[in-house]
């Protein structure tokens, strides 16, 4: 009986980090779809004073964090057209401790940048619409899902 309990304890200690990592990755994949893909592009009411102000209010609400991110990238393309670039990710980005890749195709992207001329308690954003390639973070090396956008090329 004692050896069964010891075996169970060892299994819990070994498997728990894997389960937590799996849950974290699944959340990151879900958040990528929700927070970085807007296709077709939504229109926010005029009261939001622009696309990025409406979007970033949504992003902060979804993350349950009222911190104002300095920059946020939103891709206006179907998820599947972005996802395929994480199928074979040979690069490892040590700064992020994740696999990463540069897309071969350009995508329509809105870059939301925090307006520096504002009160510290408000989050006001400028919108820039561009068409560029993406540096993506991927959930693993092969057959992966995108979990973040780390820059443009």
From Swiss-Prot:
Leader sequence residues: 1-22
One Gene Ontology biological process: defense response to Gram-positive bacterium
GO molecular function: nucleic acid binding
Function field: Does not exhibit any ribonuclease activity.
One GO CC term on file: extracellular region
Family membership noted in the UniProt record: Belongs to the pancreatic ribonuclease family.
Subcellular location: Secreted
Protein name: Probable inactive ribonuclease-like protein 13
Species in which this protein is naturally found: Rattus norvegicus (Rat)
Keywords carried by this UniProt record: Secreted, Signal
Keyword presence, Nucleotide-binding: no
Organism domain of life: Eukaryota
